[in-house]
């Protein structure tokens, strides 16, 4: 019985070992040509190493140096963070591996020095710090060949890695780590200056990483976009930045033109780009979370801007969550993408926080919070591709636009909805916009889209009249409709609070009229506005009218109690169709003391019901309206409570 039992156990052991892979200790670089499992215990040096497709290599004290490794579907097993691929490149792909940046010779020694070597003459040298360390440009180029084409790889940036500007790189951009055609890549940890460019990749997770610039965060000099680089900028003899509340006394000619000189500013290029530059490429299944970006041109970019969007692939199915952004030359988040969720992101000091650009649809921005902006968020599409911009919305977010970031020759806005699919509505809900400016800007909210709906929002607008003589107004219009392909752009405001205040003047007291219109069309063929349960209030006074030459104005159950209207002296000018119900108008009127200026057209239609007007309103219309087109019921003076019928 005992012999029989031993025989059965031996037979079972034989069957088990027959199915197990045999591990071979590698003797030399040419001994891995067959598919197998190889154990590397010493250094292997060669120009080219061929490994059997589908093999596994296990590092156990050895490494590979200076080789181009040719293999497909290679699994790599490393025990720790030491260097195992020293100056190597991969021709093929790896699978099912867990690797670290230092496995490829990257040196994690980036450090911050207390004294700046910034050569730009406007630098306050004693206050800024800069970063230095081993240049990892070559090592990162090597590791990119291993990650390109990979499947099911976990990659850790296990440290802080410096990369210097390369002579062949653009003046404002360090080299990118270029990763192509990978699937199921989880990348995490560490700090980089280099940006990462993913091309034709799917199921990519980037987490717990920091993307920094060459300098720690600092304010930028005033920047020209369309002005001449040779032009000196001063305001009343004071450097522009300080005159506008900036932190540093920049030299008189310390400003930049476009992206020229951003290397001197200490900026790095984009943090992460998902690039689909040709129609045969795509990037899908993107998840960027718990990352930090600072001192970059842009933070995360989904898709690239192109002159012909018919010649690009798709970026689809992306999440950007729980990320922070600080000091970006352009945009923390920009996209030409579909099916995107941006959630719980925050940042400060940027040109514009979020750009939902051409080709973007099914985009949700939720829980975003940004301060110190020049622009607010926008949806914008090239007119030829407007039909592909639809179903986008911003929710539960806040944006503060105070122009601490200085563009000298550009208008500003809090929200921009420019072009979109006809019949679609761009939605902004449960959000707060704070807009503060003492320099000329055309609008706070502008629209070229077919329809914009703002619901349950708060707009805090604080304006100053222009002081340097360049414009009689701080802004022309709070809500403006520009020239557009949309036949009749419309703004819908629902349960929204808008507070508009003029700032105090040092010589003449409170400024009475820092803007011309509340709503106006600037270039648009027609423009319609709808207000429902809204409260528009504040101390600022309008120079012309609240609603200027609208196609249609509908106001219901609202309170309008701003300072009043001065020059024309009426709230609503020349609407074609007007409907007001359950609304109170408060605020002194000027020249005409009239609620509505009647247009000289035959097909107008006006209806005013259950409305209360200010004591300064002596009549409803500038001219006697045609009763066939006018309906007035229960309109009263709020002081005398007397009815007004004409």
Over which residues does each language-model region extend?
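Flexible coil/linker segments and helix-coil junctions enriched in charged and small residues
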Residues: 69, 74, 113-131, 223-225, ...
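Short glycine/acidic-rich loop motifs that flank beta-strands on beta-rich extracellular proteins
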Residues: 66-70, 163-173, 191-200, 214-223, ...
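Extracellular beta-strand-rich solenoid/capping regions of secreted or surface-exposed proteins
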Residues: 44-56, 64-79, 117, 135-154, ...
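Extracellular beta-strand solenoid repeats
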Residues: 39, 45, 50, 58, ...
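All-beta strand scaffolds that present successive hydrophobic residues in beta-strands
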Residues: 51, 57-59, 75-79, 155-157, ...
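C-terminal/domain-terminus segments
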Residues: 304-314, 319
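Extracellular "leader-to-stem" segments immediately downstream of a signal peptide or signal-anchor
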Residues: 1-173, 188, 247-250, 254-263, ...
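Exposed regions on extracellular, virion, or secretory-pathway luminal proteins
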Residues: 53-54, 148-151, 179, 183, ...
């Amino acid at each position: 019985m005992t012999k029989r039992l031993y025989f059965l156990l031996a037979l079972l052991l034989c069957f088990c070992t027959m199915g197990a892979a045999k591990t071979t200790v590698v003797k030399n670089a040419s001994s891995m040509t067959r598919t197998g499992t190889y154990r590397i215990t010493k250094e292997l040096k060669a120009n080219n190493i061929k490994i059997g497709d589908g093999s596994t290599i296990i590092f156990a004290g050895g490494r590979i140096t200076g080789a181009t490794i040719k293999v497909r579907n290679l699994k790599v097993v490393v025990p720790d963070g030491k260097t195992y691929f020293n100056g190597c490149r991969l021709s093929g792909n790896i699978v099912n591996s867990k690797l670290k940046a230092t496995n490829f010779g990257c040196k994690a020694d980036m450090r911050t020095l207390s004294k700046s070597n910034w050569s730009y003459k406007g630098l306050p040298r004693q206050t800024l710090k800069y970063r230095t360390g081993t240049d990892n440009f070559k090592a990162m180029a090597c590791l990119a060949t291993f990650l390109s084409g990979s499947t099911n790889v976990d990659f850790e940036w296990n440290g802080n890695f410096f990369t210097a500007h390369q002579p062949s790189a653009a003046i404002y951009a360090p080299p990118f780590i270029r990763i192509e055609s990978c699937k199921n890549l989880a990348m995490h940890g560490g700090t980089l200056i280099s940006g990462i460019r993913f091309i034709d990749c799917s199921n990519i997770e980037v987490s717990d990483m920091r993307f920094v610039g060459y300098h720690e965060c600092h304010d930028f000099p005033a920047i020209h976009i369309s002005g001449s680089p040779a032009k000196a900028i001063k305001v009343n003899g004071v450097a522009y930045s300080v005159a506008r509340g900036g932190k540093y006394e920049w030299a008189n000619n310390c400003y930049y033109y476009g992206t020229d000189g951003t290397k001197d500013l200490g900026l790095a290029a984009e943090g992460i780009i998902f690039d689909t530059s040709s129609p045969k490429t795509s990037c899908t299944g993107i998840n960027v979370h718990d990352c930090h970006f600072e001192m970059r041109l842009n933070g995360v970019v989904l898709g690239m801007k192109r002159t012909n969007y018919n010649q690009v692939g798709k970026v689809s199915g992306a999440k950007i969550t729980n990320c922070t952004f600080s000091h970006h030359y352009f945009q923390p988040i920009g996209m030409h993408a579909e099916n995107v969720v941006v959630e719980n992101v925050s940042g400060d000091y940027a040109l514009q926080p979020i750009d939902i650009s051409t080709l973007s649809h099914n985009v949700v921005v939720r829980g975003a919070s940004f301060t110190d902006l020049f622009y607010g968020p926008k949806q914008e599409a090239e007119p030829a591709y407007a039909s592909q911009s639809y179903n986008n919305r911003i929710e539960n977010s806040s944006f503060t636009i105070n122009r601490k970031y200085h563009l000298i020759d550009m208008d500003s806005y809090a929200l921009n909805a420019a072009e979109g699919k006809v019949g679609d509505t761009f939605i902004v809900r449960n959000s707060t916009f704070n807009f503060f400016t003492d320099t000329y800007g055309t609008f706070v909210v502008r629209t070229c889209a077919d329809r914009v709906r703002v619901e349950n929002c708060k707009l805090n607008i604080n304006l100053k009249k222009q002081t340097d003589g360049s414009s009689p107004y701080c802004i022309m219009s709070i809500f403006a409709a520009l020239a557009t392909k949309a036949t009749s752009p419309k703004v819908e405001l629902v349960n929204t609070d808008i507070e508009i205040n003029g700032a105090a003047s040092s010589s003449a007291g409170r400024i009475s009229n820092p803007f011309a219109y509340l709503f106006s069309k600037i270039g648009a063929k027609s423009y319609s506005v709808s207000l429902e349960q809204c409260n528009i209030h504040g101390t600022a006074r309008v120079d012309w009218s609240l609603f200027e030459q609208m196609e249609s104005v509908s106001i219901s159950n609202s309170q309008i109690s701003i300072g009043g209207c001065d020059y024309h002296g009426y709230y609503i000018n020349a609407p074609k169709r007007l409907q007001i119900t359950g609304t109170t108008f408060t605020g002194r009127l000027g020249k005409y003391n009239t609620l509505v200026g009647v247009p000289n057209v035959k097909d107008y239609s006006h209806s005013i019901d259950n409305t209360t007007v200010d004591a300064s309103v002596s009549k409803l219309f500038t001219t006697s309206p045609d009763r066939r087109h006018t309906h007035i019921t229960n309109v009263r003076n709020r002081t005398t409570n007397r009815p007004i019928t004409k």
